[in-house]
Amino acid sequence: MRIAGLLEGLSPPAVLYLGCWSGYCAIRLVRACGMGFPYNRRLSSIILSLMIQQIRNIAIIAHVDHGKTTLVDQLLQQSGTLGDRFGPVERVMDSNELEKERGITILSKNTAIQWNDYRINIVDTPGHADFGGEVERVLSMVDSVLLLVDAVDGPMPQTRFVTQKAFAHGLRPIVVINKIDRDGARPGWVVDQTFDLFDRLGASEAQLDFPILYTSALNGYAGLDEKVRSGDMTPLFRAIVEHCPPPQVDPNGPFQMQVSTLAYNSYVGAIAIGRITRGRVRRNMPVTLVKRDGDEHREKIGQVFGFLGLQRIEVEEASAGDIIAVAGIEAPNVSDTLCDPEHVEPLPPLAVDEPTVSMTFQVNTAPFAGRDGKYLTSRQLKERLERELIHNVALRVEEGNDPEKFRVSGRGELHLSILLENMRREGYELAVSRPEVIFRERDGEICEPYEQVTVDVEERHQGGVMEALGSRRGDLKDMVPDGRGRVRLDYLVPSRGLIGFQTEFMTLTSGTGLMYHVFDHYGAARQGGIAPRRNGAMISNSTGKALGYALFNLQERGRLFVKPGDEVYEGQVVGMHSRENDLTVNPLKAKQLTNIRAAGSDENILLTPAIVFSLEQALEFIEEDELVEVTPRSIRVRKRHLKEHERKRAGKGM
């Protein structure tokens, strides 16, 4: 009826023209309105209104590893957007090398699919709360969310995090219960848990009235009945079209768009991505760029890109409601506003949660510095961190009194370790300190961050895990046995109590436990410290290649981090002592050879395999007087003071 009302009074040729548009081709109709048809301005307005009615902007949010990226693969494939030339796809949205290795989404991505006459812009967001800065800024571009929940696990801590963000933006959810074909699926329980979660988060009546779909993203089917085991994704496409509202935007007003994320192309430079909230944009159009601090610059749009499938497609013009990318803007930042020069109206800056964890990044001063990396100096380190700040909105970098040290703060250990991993792959060498939580003062009271922790363990490991979390000042909030030999424990734990806990947890549960944690709130700081590492370090007293004979004699004292032939230096931690104290050792000691024939035969040297740390494990292991040396080829643990007499002097001064 609405469309019929819009068409009333138009000439037959104009009505005929409206039947042939699809996707971006509708832009050409707008530009063709000067062909002599009557009511051409009205025709232009009607076409734009119809275009907007056919757009859906939706984000997929969920807990890590519940199947977001796999679901996007199926939507792209079954909509026909990719076409036959792409063949079968697998996690196409995880384009980053680290994402494919770890099986997690780190950066939010944009794509668009054509389904029937609808254009559906999809944003795939990270599930880890450490990348919450990504989640928060992309929610400003969409009108609804697909909330993906595992049919066995139900809502998890990070489901709560991203859902809370969506509700704060006033978005209505479409609940998708994924992995419905998984053994032990309990969709009824999951729906109840999801409803309870929404209620606790203060959802409105409209947000509580959510549609539910049951899917298997891996097998490519969806349905309205929990017993569905075949079919395709049509029910999900239909639900998106029916329950996600079209963008509430003004297509005829002066141009306005907020930059939500950034990309980079070596040919065109920085690319600003966002949703047009008002008006239209075309190539070579003059605009005003308003920075977060209110500073204004005149710029000119170079190129305009739309999203389709896996590609960015250059278009002549784009209209309000669509998610686009523009090139040609000099040094854009997230939260900047692009406006019509005659109507400069900046949008409110995007709010991002403050960091909770900090580390010190410093120049590598170890004896082997410069052997592996290309970028070593404080100037190169500073430039790299400043580049990261442009698009990593949840990151903070501060310079201290020492020009070779930078205090880097982020949303969690994973957030910072991903940055470090990217830097070492780019050829950077640096040393980093143990992660520390950030304390804040509120109303005269010192507060620290608390995290909601969910652990899923076998019942035989329950006692050890509860004792360990208790010693780290955790409060047990809930305990739910699943009736099949496992139990889920919910805790509230100070963030500093979780630093270094992951490795201990995996040891306690023999590798069978699952642990998830997410920032909850800042609360009153608890008195006393967290118990330090129980084992001391074995520290090398010389520089050279480690020898098997020396390591064979040292392994009685603890676990080794090096193997025969590895180069070590004075002050490097080469093992974990079996006792609490540090021990200075000589891993270079060779067997003394004499000209006296021994009565017995030599002992066969049998070495226990050395512990090889990942970056996260090394950061968890170190104490305050230690650093992790990060290079493109190696991850080493070392003491801050490499010489033994320096360590003794520092120890006396403490």
Where are these regions (language model features)?
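Short, often N-terminal, low-complexity regions
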Residues: I3-L7, P12-P13, G34, P38, ...
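P-loop NTPase switch module centered on the Walker A-proximal segment
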Residues: I47-V149, D153, Q193, L262-N265
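Residue-level signature of catalytic and energy-coupling elements of molecular machines
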Residues: D65, L71, G103, I122-D124, ...
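Conserved Switch II/interswitch segment of TRAFAC-class P-loop GTPases
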Residues: A129, S140-R160, R172-I174, I180-G188
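Conserved beta-strand/loop subsegment of P-loop NTPase cores
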Residues: V145-L148, G170-K179, G202-S216
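Canonical P-loop GTPase G-domain recognition
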Residues: D183-V241
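Accessory interaction regions appended to the cores of large information-processing enzymes
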Residues: D209-P211, R238-E242, A272-M654
